[in-house]
Regions:
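Short, flexible loop segments at the rims of nucleotide/cofactor-binding pockets, characterized by
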Residues: 45-51, 120-124, 156-158
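Catalytic core of membrane glycerolipid acyltransferases/transacylases, capturing the structured
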Residues: 22, 64-124
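A conditional alpha-helix N-cap/helix-loop micro-motif detector
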Residues: 52, 101, 124-128, 160-161
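Alpha-helical membrane-targeting segments
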Residues: 26-53, 104-115, 194-196
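A structural micro-motif
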Residues: 52, 92-94, 115, 142, ...
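Helix-to-loop junction immediately C-terminal to a conserved catalytic motif
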Residues: 36, 43-74
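Non-catalytic C-terminal accessory region of glycerolipid acyltransferases
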Residues: 2-23, 27, 35, 128-248
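Structural motif corresponding to alpha-helix initiation and N-cap regions
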Residues: 56, 105, 128-131
């Protein structure tokens, strides 16, 4: 049986952060949150425009309103900005799941917290908090973005690796919410790319249909749904790459 989504209304789990009280005592929480969200949105949108040339196909698969779960392959940290450009370019605001350590980086962490991005505490008893926070954003009608691999591709040809079950769990808890797969391709940033913008290509696919996943053992359901999601992402990544990956 698929466990029900967490309906408790609360902000995303708190990530490690430096102390700051520049807004405390002057504005009430709703006003603070609105200002911080605007700052975060502008920071992410500006970063996305500066770092990459983004080329995308079939972006109209991203729904204009209502919740959505966007899943993609994971090439590098900066490709998240390309994903943000795709989503904001279609007048939606993304809520990414990102490793908690990133929230401690100077400036970057402030922008992520301001934009209500979701920290992931890997290998800890707080790991489930991330999916609960993502579930709350979905219930608010927002767009949640995940990389099911959970880490950068380690394959020589950057083929997407096996996925973790978090995205499938989230999708099966919200059966009416579209799961939008995205395949990304671009050079992995390195020394030779550091001084100029590089092009990232994104191909957006039709929503992944999970209704046909056999409802047997719970763990098997999550694995089957994850494999289906990753197969669609891999197909789209090949389209973005313009060539098939090596057979495995």
């Amino acid at each position: 049986m698929i466990p029900p989504a967490n309906h408790h209304d609360a902000p995303p789990p708190a990530a490690p952060r430096p102390k700051s009280g520049c807004l405390r005592g002057r504005l009430h929480w709703p006003e603070q949150r609105a200002i911080r969200t605007i700052i975060g949105f502008l920071g992410i949108a500006l970063g996305a425009k500066v770092v990459h040339r983004v080329r995308y196909e079939r972006g109209d698969h991203i729904p204009a309103t209502g919740p959505a779960i966007i899943v993609a392959n994971h090439l590098s940290s900066t490709e998240t900005l390309a994903m943000a450009r795709l989503v904001t370019g279609h007048h939606r605001f993304p809520h990414f799941l990102a490793k908690a350590e990133v929230f401690t980086w100077p400036l970057v962490g402030r922008v992520l917290r301001a934009a209500r991005q979701i920290p992931v505490f890997r290998g800890s008893d707080r790991a489930a908090d991330s999916l609960a926070a993502a579930s709350r954003e979905i219930e608010r009608g927002h767009v949640v973005c995940l990389y099911p691999e959970g880490h950068f591709s380690s394959a020589p040809d950057l083929r997407p690796g096996p996925g973790k079950t978090g995205a499938a769990r989230l999708a099966l808890q919200h059966p009416g919410v579209p799961v939008i797969p995205v395949g990304m391709w671009g050079p992995r940033p390195g020394v030779k790319h550091i001084w100029h913008r590089h092009t990232v290509r994104l191909v957006v696919g039709d929503p992944v249909g999970l209704s046909g996943v056999p409802r047997t053992d719970e763990a098997d359901v999550y694995r089957a749904a994850t494999e289906l999601i990753m197969s669609r992402i891999t197909e789209l990544a090949e389209q973005a790459r313009g060539a098939r990956f090596d057979a495995v």
